[in-house]
Amino acid sequence: MTISQLGRPGLFFLIAAFTSTILVACGDQQDAEKKVDEGVSPLSNQATPSNTSPDGVYWGDLHIHSRLSMDSFSFGNRMLSADDAFKFAKGEPIEAHTGDIAQLKKPLDFLLVSDHAEFLGVIASIIDRKHGIDETELGKRWKGWFEENNIQAILDEWVGTLDEASSPVGAEAQNIEYPPASFFNEVWRDMVDMAERHNDPGKFTAFSGYEWTSMIDGDNLHRVVIFRDGPEKTSGVVPVSSIESSDPEYLWARLEDYEQKTGGQVLALPHNSNLSEGRMFSETRISGAMVDTAYANTRIRWEPVLEMTQVKGDSETHPLVSPEDDF
């Protein structure tokens, strides 16, 4: 099966199904080995594998930030946009912010530019003097810090809006003025349109999505939200921000609203669970109630896949679980 037979729907299916298939296979193998150890012959599985599932392997990236993300812009990416990211993924040369020319040896099959939903595009708009954000109290304050090269003050205030416990400015940042919804609507539509312009069925899949950046007491509960659909459905919504709620159950409810209203499909990918101090898989919900069957069913409905590894760490295991693992 070729990538031309997949596009957004097929790749979305692969992303959702891949981890589940691995987990089921591992479980079956472990059960069989256990039965053999107990002296019981395992039963033969007479089921015939289906030929309808995609069997190709495709390479891409589901977590990358452009200058629209607060951290990316603050850490030095002042000019590279989602457009540059898509061009780079498709094998085109781009100029990095260092002035170097960068180009992949082999193009990717798909890409999602998952900018942070929280203050999406705000710092870039302030410095670019667009949308009038630079004339607000927030804009004037951040612009002043930027011109003083006090980037840390901007980051502290931004992180404080996500989690006061992990920011030096603490609760003060919780009262920060937030740009109007109309601003984020415009930024999001531009993001969706950009993905659509680069989406090339049969050659390259450009997903629309974002990162929901929840933190509680400094523990990372981030999710990457991935839409299967094009702008005819995704442009009518705006990214869900953890400033609205840091509870993943709130995010899942909003994703359900999207599917019910548009008939589209979306999933959430837990990101950097290795930085969650175990909270990503806690037996207690954010509300304080214990995890139950209904919660588990809801979570697997919206989060069928888990990010296993990336440059900021691995989430496959833990030193307490695998003390002999050298890696």
Residue ranges: model-predicted function:
Residues 1-8:
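N-terminal secretory signal peptides that target proteins for export/translocation
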Residues 10-22:
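Bacterial N-terminal signal peptides
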Residues 26-327:
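Extended, charged catalytic domains and RNA/DNA-binding interfaces, predominantly
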